[in-house]
Amino acid sequence: QIGRIVGYLNKADRVLVCGCGSSGLSAKEMEIRFMRIGIDVDSMTDSDMIKMASVFQNRRSLIFGFSISGEREEVTYLLREAYNKGAKTVLFTTNNGKKFSEYYSEVVALSSLRHLNYGNVISPQFPILIILDIIYAYYVEQNKYIREGMHDSTLCALEE
């Protein structure tokens, strides 16, 4: 599954990552990390912006949606509409029900504790960030010198 997702990243012209609440923080983290290695990526956390973004997706788009419960309406709406327009869509959720398979290219099952979405014991972002680290490492490894060069260039830009 990770290999397929990295393949989607390699082929996408544009990547959009969305999530609300603590999942939105993970979306922003993905944007920052993957931008630094050359991916044209944006993150969205505003409910209205997420819904409106569905209009602009096409077969060259890749959409990542983060929803611990898998039921955040804005996130599922964007993924469903983008999928119907030919985009690749990936839902990250702890809820791996059958209902997801018809609208998403991939459903990444996250490990979970009971009531993880409440965030009162372990950060709800934690399982998302772990899987993002795995995807990041796999993606960088496929073309290490170019990706590391891009990362170094972003460091230089920050020092200017």
Regions found by a protein language model. Name each.
Residues 1-11:
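A short, well-structured juxtamembrane/interface segment
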